[in-house]
A protein has these predicted regions:
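Unchanged
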Residues: 1-247, 358
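Left-handed beta-helix
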Residues: 1-6, 192-193, 200-364
Length: 364
């Protein structure tokens, strides 16, 4: 079974999650962040998936629906939305979220539980992870990446990994050098062990998953690391979100992330193809269905339904769904949320390390 935490680390991209969950943050022209963990699970044969929601999950439910787009609309197993009970946001952290969906965990008949958030963009084959877990006889297998910890990553866990792959040490939010093994927030564990560990933490009023569940039990459990060397970007800041979208301009990244043998599924919206005016010019950009381009677009990501007026120049921008840009505008290093209107002849300039953000439904 799989469990996806749709609200984790929302504070890192507060501009984008003010009215939506982390899981429903748009990405890559037509996707949402939750599409990547959900598709990876489905492609790996996981047919029972629970999505833990804490708040602002209306857009998430609209996107997921019955799970039909991921072949999870079925009589047995399928997709389950797990909102908080009693109208409250529930206990804090991943442990609190697991405690709130304890009935779902106990009801499942699956042997293993795969836990992950929505803030890491990657396309993982979890069959390889399960094979590694069984081969090592691990109680817990954590997915990690070797390299420099992303800047502004929330409470990063850094592991000390032995030659056999066993985790012998764990530091949280250290001043770690490059080349360390840091956590991607993905974990495989036996379902019955997870229920026991969560119950033990809750009974002691301990709600930090990394400190209280993992770090505290590191000596008594067999914890192994699975190093993922493919493309993975953690959305831990607005700049990181911008950079992750810009990374899609690289054909090698697109080929790996959107591997036809492990497709990324999403909700299908019936739109007309993108339309280009006589004076339009588009280079090195991702332009989604439904766009109307009459100006110049360079090195940018345009989501569905975006309109670019005549003589408008868009460079190094991420323009979300149904936004309208008037004529004669100049935009460079701008992140624009949904349904924004930019009037004629406006000039908006940011920088690669500090892109300008325009909030949802704003008029500039």
């Amino acid at each position: 079974m799989g469990l996806i935490f749709s609200n984790e680390h929302e504070e890192c991209v507060r501009e984008l999650t003010e009215s939506r969950t982390m899981g429903s943050v748009p990405f890559g022209g037509r996707y949402r962040l939750i599409d990547f963990p959900l598709s990876s699970m489905v492609n790996s044969g996981i047919n029972e998936v629970g999505v833990v929601a804490r708040g602002n999950y209306q857009s998430l439910m609209d996107h997921l629906g019955s799970g039909k787009s991921w072949d999870l609309s079925r009589k047995r197993d399928g997709l389950f939305i797990l909102p908080p009970f009693g109208g409250s946001a529930g206990a804090p952290g991943r442990v609190g979220a697991l405690a709130s969906c304890g009935r779902f965990l106990k009801k499942s008949k699956e042997e293993y539980a795969l836990l992950m958030g929505c803030d890491t963009v990657c396309n993982l084959n979890f069959r390889d992870l399960l094979a590694r877990h069984a081969e090592t006889g691990a109680d817990i297998t954590v997915v990690c990446r070797r390299g420099k910890v992303p800047e502004k990553m929330a409470d990063p866990a850094v592991y000390t990994v032995g030659p056999d792959g066993r985790v012998s040490g764990m530091l949280i939010s250290p001043d770690a050098p490059g080349g360390c093994c840091y956590d991607l927030g993905i974990l495989l564990i036996r379902r019955d062990l997870l229920i026991r560990l969560v119950g033990d933490c809750v009974s002691r009023n301990l709600y930090s998953f990394k400190r209280d569940l993992l770090q505290r039990n590191l000596a008594s459990l067999r914890v192994y690391a699975y190093e993922f060397g493919g493309f993975a970007r953690t959305v831990c800041s607005t700049v990181a979100y911008f950079d992750a979208n810009m990374a899609l301009m690289d054909p090698a990244v697109r080929a790996e992330l959107f591997d036809p043998s492990r497709p990324i599924y999403t909700k299908v919206r019936d739109d007309m193809p993108a339309r280009y005016g006589l004076g339009a010019s588009v280079s090195n950009s991702l332009v989604a269905d439904g766009c109307v381009v009459e100006g110049r677009v360079e090195n940018s990501v345009l989501f569905r339904g975006v309109r670019v007026g005549k003589d408008t120049v868009v460079q190094n921008c991420v323009i979300l769904q149904d936004s309208v840009l008037g004529s004669g505008c100049r935009l460079n290093y701008v992140i624009m949320d949904k349904n924004v209107v930019i009037k004629n002849d406006r000039l908006l300039f940011g920088f690669q390390s500090y892109p300008v953000f325009i909030a949802k439904s704003s008029v500039v």
